[in-house]
Amino acid sequence: MKITYKTNVLDVIRLVENNTPALWEKEYNNFPNTWGGANALTKKVVKDLLVMINLPYSKELAGFIKYIVECPNTIRYSEYKRSLIGKTIEDVIFD
C-alpha cells in the first residue's frame, strides 16, 4: 500500500499499531533500562516507522506517530482515534 497525504489516517494508525510491537522487541535489548533508554528507544521506533510510512519528514507527523506509539491503550487515545474517522493524513497533520 502506497501512503500519501490523501491516505485515510486510520490506515496509517493501523500500520503503526501493527508494526510497533515487532520494532520494539527488535530494539529493546539495545537500550539501557532507564528513562533515557526508554526515550531513546521510542525515538528509534518512531524513526523506523517514519521510514516505513515513507512520507517527507515533518515535526507534526513525527509527533503524531510518537503519540500512537506511547499511548495505544488509553481511553483518551481511543476517543482521539474515533474522532479521526474519515480524515486523511493531510487533515490531521496540517490542521
Stretch-by-stretch model annotation:
Residues 39-49, 89:
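Short, charge-rich amphipathic interface segments used for partner binding and complex assembly
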Residues 4-32, 51-79, 91:
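Amphipathic alpha-helical oligomerization segments
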Residues 35-37:
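Short basic-aromatic helix/loop recognition motifs at nucleic-acid
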Residues 81-95:
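Amphipathic alpha-helical binding modules
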